């Protein structure tokens, strides 16, 4: 499974748990943004519709795996400053050959790529890094959230480590795209406790 849903037995129940934890008894758009990304429209009782996340190769915009993939692509194609490239390779003790091996020949490349994304959080002050994260979040909003009917009148809530640790950039992306940002929480338990009380 390519999503950050270790606390959940199945995708369907995890989406419902996330929606309930985020929206409570109100309608809204619930988004999961961790190793993978996902979203659904929730009517206050159940999930009405879901835009397929498509996994980290074709979709999963804004996820840790997608951010890691974009980061590695920019590092290997010299789109980051030489200083950032050197800092990245040194911090993770990697060579370009190691990266290719981990992505194309080893199992779970999505997890490997997601494990690199904290480098972006540590270097958000760099304009090229901030732009990479911002553009990935805007792509998530455009390709997922904006597909839901009446999205302009719904609060859009987020759960997951990526949404939580990059909440400032996520808020900037939402503002630029004209999206009403709701709650941003790290773990589903916070919201579920509130939902069931």
Over which residues does each language-model region extend?
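Conserved acidic
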Residues: 1, 63, 128-132
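Phosphate-binding/catalytic loop of phosphoryl-transfer enzymes
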Residues: 11-83
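Short, small-residue-biased leader/transition segments that mark boundaries at the very start
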Residues: 1-2, 6-13
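ATP-binding/phosphotransfer module of carbohydrate and carboxylate kinases, centering on a glycine-rich
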Residues: 21-29, 70-197
């Amino acid at each position: 499974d390519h999503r950050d849903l270790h606390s959940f037995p199945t995708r369907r129940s995890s989406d419902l748990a996330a929606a309930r934890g985020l929206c409570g008894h109100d309608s809204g758009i619930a988004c999961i943004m961790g190793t993978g990304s996902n979203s659904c429209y929730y009517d206050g009782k159940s999930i009405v519709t879901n835009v397929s996340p498509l996994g980290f190769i074709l979709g999963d915009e804004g996820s840790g795996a997608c951010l890691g993939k974009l980061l590695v692509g920019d590092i290997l194609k010299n789109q980051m400053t030489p200083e950032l490239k050197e800092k990245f390779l040194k911090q993770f003790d990697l060579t370009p050959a190691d990266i290719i091996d981990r992505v194309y020949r080893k199992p779970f490349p999505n997890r490997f790529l997601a494990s690199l994304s904290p480098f972006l959080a540590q270097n958000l002050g760099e304009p090229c890094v901030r732009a990479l994260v911002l553009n990935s979040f805007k792509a998530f909003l455009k390709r997922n959230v904006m597909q839901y009917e009446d999205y302009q009148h719904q609060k859009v809530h987020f759960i997951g480590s990526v949404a939580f640790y990059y909440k400032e950039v996520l808020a900037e992306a939402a503002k630029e795209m004209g999206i009403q940002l709701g709650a941003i929480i790290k773990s589903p338990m916070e919201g579920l406790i509130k939902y069931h009380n």
